[in-house]
């Protein structure tokens, strides 16, 4: 079907060379915003070549004359007079007094530079409006319902061109989580768009929606994103829109996954006639507990909705396995026109579906410092659990969700904003956005702020090279030394992956025997940049993802964070059926020493470790008696980046001796039951009158043995007793 090409009459003309389809002209910029930027907004310049602003506190303000405005994120935007890059000297949560409006062009907000646990915005929206060339990376935006008057989106891009959002986590909006309207040349990639508040405080009622996209003369690209736990609009398309929807993962939608508006719903702004275009390629849709339309991915609203589809997987059976299939046009409903070819020049890469699925979960969202909210979302998608939510609060019990009655309506409350570590930013003497240790290692002058805009061989400035390094997984290695890296912690905390490492540059890398740590060894006398590659195998599905590039800075300063070390543990012994207790000890060689956190490296049933104290407890199953078991534990520090170490514990599990039971008669109706065994295990005494049906009469874990129990056994018939170990 190609006749539709003649109906396009609008033009967008910018830049110096163009791709053309029909009468629509679209600029193709040769320099991506950063390595890995794709799609319509990939050419955004951001703050390239401009000044640098440091966010030094988590405050916000209302009045433009407020003396506390200096050092805030809001003032970093408001005071920009030209290209600017905003970096962070503090991590934590910023409670917005009102919507944070990004209305300045040529601006980069580099959330990946925040120390500690990164940056979260809450209470109000992040709005990018009336701007061009904006880059926003590695932020969390979780407004919630703290402000009873708030009815907005989490993130809204409106009347903009050349904007890219990368690795942004958005949730708990009252309207849509992330919307783009009246804009063109916008990319939303590697973002997690999750848990819009369904029955909240919107004046239209239930409004748990993902994205509203409409009114733009150019192209929008949504690539490699997660949509999870929205009632609908995953996304919703309006008039005058061309959307590349590629390699996204949709999970647990409610009434509808995605759909298009129609002539009537978008009538106010479609005087020229309703039209939209959708390229729906390489997506995965998985129905969840809240899904009511498990077999439909997208519903068209008019014949002027033109759809091209290719290689999409739909898993609607809710059987707990990842076994989606491509049902072709069968997953599309409503009214629309099919396209046999991509409706405009294709520039966005398409990843194989299973690899795209894993990459979204492995490295998507604000994954550099993945908080407990995103970790919980990850587990709900992996385990095919979770639910739509209505409000943010603290459940009274130790759980993630709680149903409460509010004004006669049952609402699902979700656990709210986690506390975030502020961290400590590295020294930056010239305040050019690049730490001193970085500048020294790569041959820049830490006392000359002008070198931040020096162009490199790949077309990026020196500052952009640093920002791009910080945006991916990264480690620091000492000169003439080595560093051990825990890949599990570095790459998002996803259990159930087997790692593979590949050769990189300026160093050698080896996967250690525990399968999750690598050792990188720097070449003798070298300082500067290196890297290595990591791929992963998901053990549950057999699918592979990667490789992912891990950047290494070989430093000439003492900026490296040394890993902690465990104190030796002797051979441990425990009786089966009892609890092994041991306190782990570790030290940190850094000055000053970092705070240490202990954890279980390889999960075992009944095994736990207190994070702050290292107190280990393991309730040993009776069935393991007479065996030798291995436990794996780990410790990590609070440095930047966090370093860790693992330790193997060997446990000899002694078998429980067979207990003995004796019955001494006291008188005609009373007996004394005597139990001989060992302290610790649970014993079960059972009674029978026919040696076939046995009934438990007592379960005990006596403090001392032998243990005596008085039995009254009425009736003339025989009674039999036996003893066994509780399972």
Language-model-detected regions and their locations in the chain:
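Right-handed parallel beta-helix
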Residues: 106, 110-111, 132-143, 159-172, ...
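Extracellular beta-rich repeat passengers
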Residues: 237-410
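Extracellular beta-strand-rich solenoid/capping regions of secreted or surface-exposed proteins
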Residues: 69-82, 93-110, 119-137, 143-161, ...
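Surface-exposed or secretory-pathway low-complexity segments enriched in glycine-proline
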Residues: 481-521, 548-552, 567-569, 574-583, ...
